[in-house]
Amino acid sequence: MIIVPDASVILKWVLEKASESDQVQARWLQESILADQVEIRLPTLWRFEVGNVLGLKQPKLAKELFSVLLAYDFEEVPLGNDYAQEVLEHMREVNGVTFYDAAYHVLALRMKGLYLTADLAYVKKAKRKGHVALLAEWECGSQRVL
């Protein structure tokens, strides 16, 4: 199973908040990665999104936390012309979404995988495109997609 988690999911592994309802799913995904039960693909822009949040929210720990995430050595997909054009087309079709979110979703569509996000607003806008799930509603390990 190919999963494309966005920054909102990845950050849960290092900025843990027990009060968040989707923490169980985030932890399950992390454990599944370590056990080689799922394959992760990410657009290269994930580094910028995650680095930005860590630098702003945890400036004293940002370098250490970012190193932990980089150690996963995720397979990254560069944003070439064809990919970028698909992202822009996706934005046109799904009004009001960001290039960042669309890049993750388009990658999941291209890989026939699942875009996993904690962003309810995005899922509501884009679920008709398929291959997207809200982390809090994700049935860990199943192929259920919205």
What do the predicted segments below correspond to?
Residues D6, D101, D119:
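Acidic active-site catalytic centers that drive phospho-/nucleotidyl reactions
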Residues V9-I10, E49-V53, L69, E86, ...:
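A general alpha-helix detector
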